[in-house]
Amino acid sequence: MQSFQQDCVELALEKFRRGEMDRRTLLAGLAMLGVGAGAAQQAAAQAQQTIVMANWGGLVNQAFTRYYAEPFMAANPGFRVVQDSASPSAGRIRSMVESGRVTWDLCDSSATSAFMLGGMGLLNPVDYSVVNRENVTGPTFALEHGAAPYSYSNVLVYDSRRFPEGPRSWADFWDLRRFPGTRLLRRDATGTLDAAQMSLGTPLDSLYPLDVRAALARVREIRRNLVFWTSGAESEQFIRTGEAVMGQLWHTRAKVLETESNGRFKFIWNQGILQPGIFVSPRGNPAGPAAQRLLASMLAGAEYQVRLLQFFGNGPTNPRAAAMVPAEFRRFNPTEPANAAVQVAQNGRWWGENYARVNAEYIDMVTGG
């Protein structure tokens, strides 16, 4: 199952292959995500303490060094930062910690994993005497066992050629009479069941805990009119080809569809599911407290977060970033105040406590079990 972070890398490479950006811009944008490959440094750097960041895909260490490592190392000359692009899934983090062979210091993860792994005692708590809580817009982005330098959303995308008066809510998404045609959902319960619950009329401020039985039954109602995606590129393709007339996609893919189709494919922020791009530190990480200093630097870099929004669409989480966002990008920013106001902040704690069981039930249902 492809993660959001992996899809960000793939999306950048697609734009590069289409000639929509040059190599320098590609490297700069990937650096905003902290994406790169670990490489040997100069002999003089060997005496420095190394911080290893694990991400979901990588190209070159030089780009990461230029945009994240160099500013951090300039302020902290005793450290160097390298990348490991080995995909830090919850399972891999758990295996590392339980085996006592931890090689990662900071991992691009999720709120669900932060609560799940943190509850198992496998993560270091964030040291908020080092990491400034005021550098994020709210508690969703600053958790006990992780903090978020970016955000993303699950949103409703539709074909306006088929539906000039398009759907305005998840209730409309489930209304096959008014909006006939095949729907598209992710082959994963997170986001999907949140939307199913909203389609039943549950207010956003009382969405959690989810009524799992009711949400699963709601998906089952339209099962014969559903197709499922496992990667961002696949979700985009389902919509482009018309195999699905509407779907739930990551907002970054929704942006590509809307801009490249000149508005034929549209998306709405209403009832979007806003999620933090959480970074976590495995218990027993080699660099120890230094990982907290790097995390603090990432959250403080509002200008870099805005550049990431411009490049990929990932939303900034630093409150200072809002005033820096160019007007033409506000439409696509999940944390733009007007956009965030009509979304629901996904409850990572609930998902962390329930994901394994609920997702297994969901997969069993959608695969015909």
Residue ranges and their predicted role:
Residues 1-21, 25, 32:
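N-terminal secretory signal peptides
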